[in-house]
């Protein structure tokens, strides 16, 4: 429907590709597409359904997609094939933190890029807590329980303990900044600069405010 926001299912995979290849080439193309087409999107890193890959066809070369599938499998991700056909990948069930090699630095950078991406950021709770792949939950589930890898039920004690970690506090600081800085407005002007494939600058401006 006209005027409705849509989920940006491209961003998670394009960002992972950018990190692996140290190049923002394909992500930059998509950012410019969002801006020129005036798309209204909700962006995310991980979600309850894993990391979508089928959506990347046409944006990423097939070999880059398959390379990413293999990388995430080595990091504990479980591949969901379309209609059960192994050659027809659909999504990788994996926490975003594990997809990033469980690197605090990459997780924080991913969150920073997310809040500066065009659109409205949505946060999956397990990403915020830097959750790792929950293999035990998958084993306890039925044959279709692959999604449980990214749906850990945190206890109150686990949540409180995680809140004390730097990676969680740093993400919360970024989210507070996104929610309170006047530069991030629905009517903001977003400028994109990239002087080299490994460099990307996103600037939001609204009235006298910029970020």
Task: Mark where each language-model region is.
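Active-site and adjacent substrate-binding regions of carbohydrate-active enzymes
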Residues: 1-211
């Amino acid at each position: 429907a006209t005027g409705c926001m849509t989920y940006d299912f491209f961003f998670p995979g394009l960002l992972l590709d950018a990190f692996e290849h140290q190049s923002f080439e394909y992500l930059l193309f998509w950012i410019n597409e969002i801006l020129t087409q005036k798309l209204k999107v909700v962006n995310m890193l991980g979600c309850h359904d894993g990391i979508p890959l089928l959506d990347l066809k046409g944006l990423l070369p097939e070999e880059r997609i398959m390379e990413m599938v293999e990388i995430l499998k080595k990091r504990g991700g479980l591949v969901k094939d379309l209609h059960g056909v192994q050659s027809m990948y659909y999504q990788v069930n994996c926490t975003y933190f594990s997809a990033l090699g469980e690197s605090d630095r990459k997780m924080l950078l991913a969150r920073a890029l997310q809040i500066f991406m065009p659109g409205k950021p949505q946060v999956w709770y397990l990403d915020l807590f830097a959750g790792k792949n929950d293999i035990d939950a998958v084993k306890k589930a039925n044959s279709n329980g692959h999604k449980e890898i990214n749906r850990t039920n945190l206890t109150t004690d686990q949540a409180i303990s995680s809140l004390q970690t730097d990676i969680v506090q740093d993400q919360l600081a970024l989210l507070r900044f996104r929610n309170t800085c006047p530069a991030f407005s629905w009517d903001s002007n977003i400028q994109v600069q990239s002087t080299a494939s490994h460099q990307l600058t996103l600037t939001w401006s609204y009235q006298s405010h910029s970020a």
